[in-house]
Amino acid sequence: MSHPQTSENPAVIPAGMKQLNLLAGFMETNGPLWGRLHEDDGLPVMGFRVELRHCNPMQICHGGMLMTFADMLLGFTCGIAAGGRKFMPTINLTGDYVGPAPLGAWVEGHGRLIRQTRNLSFAEAMITADGAPCLRTSGIMKIPSQETREGNVLALFREEHR
């Protein structure tokens, strides 16, 4: 049975997703990333469509791209959980590759906050490719002592679709 949001129909972006305005630097090269705030917990759900430029020679999404996506997802999860106005540098990021994300697949993750202290934020996610697990990830982010100009991560999820 073919689902409309699979590698068989790469143009489909899931309903409710908005393109995140990450138009500078590293993420401009690796995006676009899509996102929305989860209706139950207000934390980010993010995704991207695997393109050829994301793939290894076997036309499977490169592990480096999956970890880049995980870093963004967990960083935004921690940032939003802390009020949405702080950019959170990564202290530690781990990942276990549990399945492939083939060319054309829709890769998606929903961050989950585990714990927050005064200085650190801990999060995890199971990232899927067309609904099947592909990367289990966890991370520790540093909570900065003050808000940063470029740290309003919550605003990224509230902007109009571009």
Label every model-predicted segment:
Residues 1-162:
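Terminal targeting signals and extreme-terminal segments of soluble enzymes
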